[in-house]
Amino acid sequence: MTNNTKTITLNIGPQHPATHGVLRLILEMDGEVVNNADPHIGLLHRGTEKLIEHKTYLQAIPYFDRLDYVSPMCQEHAFALAVESLLECEVPRRAQFIRVLFSELTRILNHTLNIGSQALDIGATTPLLWLFEEREKIMEFYEHVSGSRMHSNYFRPGGVAADLPEGLLEDIDKFIEQFPPKLHDIESLLNENRLWKQRLVDIGVASQKEAMDWGFSGPMLRGSGIAWDLRKSNPYDVYDEMDFKVPIGKNGDCYDRYFVRMLEMYESIKIIKQCIEKMPKGAIKTDDPKLTPPTRAKMKESMEAMIHHFKLYTEGYDVPAGETYKAVEAPKGEFGVYLYSQGGNRPYRCRIKAPGFAHLQGLDFMSKGHLMADVITIIATLDIVFGEIDR
């Protein structure tokens, strides 16, 4: 008997809700089994790296909010660290604690969206509704410090833009007290749910070797059982003073990646608690007048201060010639910024390393042999955002 099966080519996206952005995915299928998955990217390319070359170092910060727009402050953090490395400037301790505090709030902001939308893709609507309620509270904290719910533009080379408003630490403390029970509720719905496990266990497996070979990082790498976290291996700001664990998976499948993200939120809560308890008093920006604008009060009294403020925001400051690479443990993985300065007020080159770019490349090998419905599950656990992939 001859086998007369014929492969089908199927286009998914770029306007499909399950692709989490403008992903065009070309599937080569034998019946409903996937033989090849070919992702086409570039539909959200905005030339960010080139645009930054024509901006001062201060004007470049808002571009980082618009890369992975689900976790903006972590990307600002990477750029701020890179500029500080070239300037060799000291960041006040209070500013470092504020940065770490908001980086961990950003991690929760990212993971709640990922787990909620992943559950929705698989057919569970309740987790998304519950988690969006919690995300809204974090976005309010963003709004309190920066005036914006999403594109915060809050971190600065040398510190942060403004001090914490009165009462904000108490509000964050209340939030992290009531948040773990909400996570337990989500876990009670999903962890041992028969349908959830059938859709996630042994789907999209990436072995330790494959995860390393494809350049995975963050929960994608830790889900495969490799305990690599830049906050531990290459700590920045005050992460070396924080007590937390690095959760890892065993099998490298979709379920492990989901569970790693869930456990990471509990660790983020621990770090936020420590930041609130240890938060020192003091300055929130470096005292170098070349980097820090004068206060409003000084500008009302002194013409020189007014001129200084105007020059700082129009011309910016010169950064010594040199090159540096700084990376942070963003919620999706290692987000890195390579900066090359020729000594002027604008970067000669700014190369951005986005974790989602490497993760999307692995979609093909993780999808092979699975059903089409499983591809949607795998895309959800990759946690991709096209702002950072296409740049």
Swiss-Prot record:
The keyword NAD applies. It is an enzyme of class 7 (translocase). It is a peripheral membrane protein. InterPro entries: NADH_Q_OxRdtase_suD, NADH_UbQ_OxRdtase_49kDa_CS, NDH1_su_D/H, NiFe-Hase_large. GO terms for molecular function: NAD binding; NADH:ubiquinone reductase (non-electrogenic) activity; quinone binding. Its EC number is 7.1.1.-. It is found in: Cell inner membrane. The keyword Secreted does not apply. Gene3D superfamilies: Cytochrome-c3 Hydrogenase, chain B. Pfam families: Complex1_49kDa. It catalyses: a quinone + NADH + 5 H(+)(in) = a quinol + NAD(+) + 4 H(+)(out). It comes from the Bacteria. One of its GO terms (cellular component) is plasma membrane. Coiled coil: none annotated. Keywords: Cell inner membrane, Cell membrane, Membrane, NAD, Quinone, Translocase, Transport, Ubiquinone. NDH-1 is composed of 14 different subunits. Subunits NuoB, C, D, E, F, and G constitute the peripheral sector of the complex. NDH-1 shuttles electrons from NADH, via FMN and iron-sulfur (Fe-S) centers, to quinones in the respiratory chain. The immediate electron acceptor for the enzyme in this species is believed to be ubiquinone. Couples the redox reaction to proton translocation (for every two electrons transferred, four hydrogen ions are translocated across the cytoplasmic membrane), and thus conserves the redox energy in a proton gradient. HAMAP family: NDH1_NuoD. Belongs to the complex I 49 kDa subunit family. NCBIfam families: NuoD, PRK06075.1. This is NADH-quinone oxidoreductase subunit D. It comes from Rickettsia conorii (strain ATCC VR-613 / Malish 7). The gene is nuoD.
